[in-house]
Amino acid sequence: VDLYEKGGSYKLKVMEIYQAGAGRINEAFEKLKAELEEMGMFDACYKQKLPDYINRIGVVAAYPGEAVHDIVENATRRNPFIEILVYPAYVQGEQAPLSIVRGIDTLQGRNVDVIILARGGGSTEDLWAFNERMVADAVFNCPIPIVSAIGHEQQVSISDLVADMR
């Protein structure tokens, strides 16, 4: 920083510029997105249709939580006889990706018609577990249709892109 007292101005000398914060996160997101897109994991031909009649829903979400509350409230209002199985998962932090994958795997053996991945809104970092490769693979390879309900509408995760419905 140089100071010019006479004019009362400062001059900044920039020695280095680099992307920080969301830049690196966005770069990782775009890299994985491009890789999975090239593999065809977002292609419509792989999207499973939801059953016409849904009797049993599996939910992978933090429990208790607002996301689960909203799903239960809306589903039972439409069909008071619907069964909802909740797999309580970590949806944020280091343990979250494996916890989400275990939830998907567990619910596959519970005779559910559809699986909902749910997590309320948050920062990109808070939602990052749904951008991990292991979660994308579990969603893509699941024989049961998966609905992704992650974050706010304007937030898009890798899980949203791979899932059968968003």
Report each predicted region and the residues it spans.
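Short, glycine/charged-enriched hinge/interface segments at domain edges or termini
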Residues: 1-87
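Short glycine/threonine-rich loop/turn motifs
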Residues: 54-166
